[in-house]
Amino acid sequence: ITFENTAGRVGQAVACFIEGDRAYFKNCRFLGNQDTLYNYGKESRQYFENCYVEGTVDFIFGWSTVLFKDCTIHSVGDGYVTAPATDKGKKYGYVFVNCKLTGADEAKKVYLSRPWRPYAQAVYIQCELGKHIVPEGWNNWGKKENEKTAYYAEYQNTGEGASVKERASFGHQLKNLDGYNVEEILLGEDGWNPVKNGNKLLKNIKR
């Protein structure tokens, strides 16, 4: 399935708005520019596998707990990949695992994230980061105080944009993956495990 907003570069133009819990997407495309994918629900857990998401400014944004696995995240211009609004006290915000971050020729200055809300969270685990990712990696959205509350981290990323020598000082480099087992990130209180049960879930969908 392809979700596309064809409005062009006119400001916010959401292609897909997700509020419900236990949202599962596999082999889908999300096309747009600013604010392509709105992970809206504060209590929502969302899983994306082998999906393609493209945009420019804050094109993955919202309050939800979201796991991207084996996805391609493509910047079609300068901007910010994510703009999390994670609530205070939430264990996870955005988690990217084994994803590839690519950029169009005109995408030369892209940040991994900036905090839409103070307690924003985004973690990139063993992802391939293209040269369009700026050396600083993270942006504080013009508010120094966000650096004390937002949680941004990386683990064993590769690619031209993965060097940590000039990373923003408020970012973290994980030494291990304690707390980031992909089968536990979305568990919640009901034990939802789309990573393990993904194929079974797809088979149970009535067509």
Model-derived regions, located:
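Sequence-level preference for short, compositionally simple segments enriched
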Residues: I1-R207
